[in-house]
Design a protein with these regions (language model features):
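Short, Lys/Arg-enriched segments at the junction into DNA-binding effector domains
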Residues: 2, 116-178, 182, 233, ...
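A general structural signal marking secondary-structure boundaries and capping sites
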Residues: 43-44, 72, 121-125, 175, ...
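Positively charged, aromatic-enriched patches within helix-turn-helix-type DNA-binding elements
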Residues: 150-220, 225-227
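Glycine-rich nucleotide-binding loop
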Residues: 35, 226-230
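Residues at or immediately flanking beta-strands
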Residues: 2, 26, 76, 136, ...
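N-terminal/domain-start alpha-helical segments
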Residues: 1-125
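Residue-level signal for beta-strand positions within conserved beta-sheet cores that form or flank
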Residues: 23, 73, 140, 217, ...
């Protein structure tokens, strides 16, 4: 397994590299955005995961994350940053990161999160779910391709990030079931100690903008007051009594 660590603090970068190498990983280092993107572009074999700082010279980690996502929606990205505000985390997730850890950090937790992301990449269908859907799934005017990470509506094609696709897959696999926010965090994010339930809401809003004709009055991803969400692939024309917070 090959890891790219993007970190401008040389001592920290080298310390991380040493510890991951002790675990059997192949590690490359980059100290800024252009270096990281060039390293990714020229990699052979390709990298299996990126560990990314946010405060980098010249090009922020957010920009790097977006650039990576334009090239590869499936490559796992773990942000490791001293930024602790919820706004920073939300911006990182909006840019496409899969996990977010703050500095200072516990090395065993970092190693565990990396293993978790790599395992999920190797076995994307091995989830604690009811029934795994086929490679393609259709509901309403929405067509989902789980292999290409594409979502198609009548007029638009959306390239989903790994987390967006895993969240949508999770909803589809639990069609009709009420899911709590903490349950979603546990099963989709895996190790959510740095994730807030608000992050779940933000990702739901993004999915709604893609799949709902009117995101303010959703028909497929319904809010359940005080609990979480319920996905309905084929909603009743008159709505559902559990939909008590239409636009939340």
């Amino acid at each position: 397994m090959r890891i790219l660590i993007v970190e401008d603090e040389i001592t920290l970068a080298e310390g991380l590299a040493f510890n991951f190498q002790q675990e059997g990983y192949q590690v490359d280092l980059a100290s800024d955005g252009p270096d990281a993107l060039e390293t990714l572009e020229q990699a052979d074999p390709e990298f299996d995961i990126v560990i990314l700082d946010l405060m980098l010279p010249g090009m922020s980690g957010y920009e790097i994350c977006r650039e990576i996502r334009e090239r590869d929606v499936q490559l796992p990205i773990l942000v490791l940053s001293a930024r602790t505000l919820s706004e920073d985390k939300a911006q990182a997730f909006d840019a496409g990161t899969d996990q977010y850890m703050t500095k200072p950090f516990a090395l065993p937790e970092l190693l565990s999160r990396v293993r978790n992301l790599l395992e999920r990449r190797q076995r994307p269908d091995n989830n604690n779910t009811v029934d795994s859907p086929d490679p393609q799934f259709q509901f309403g005017n929405v067509s989902v391709d789980f292999l290409s990470f594409q979502l198609t509506t009548d007029d638009d094609v959306h390239n989903l990030t790994r987390i967006e696709m895993e969240l949508l897959r999770y909803f589809i696999e639990h069609d009709g079931m009420v899911l709590t926010r903490h349950q979603i965090l546990r099963d989709v994010w895996g190790e959510p100690s740095e994730i807030t339930t608000r992050s779940t809401d933000n990702f739901v809003m993004r999915l709604r903008r893609m799949i709902e004709p009117d995101p303010a009055q959703p028909r497929h991803i319904l809010s359940v007051r005080g609990t979480g969400y319920r996905f309905i692939a084929n909603p009743d024309p008159v709505g559902n009594s559990l939909q008590s917070e239409p636009g939340s």
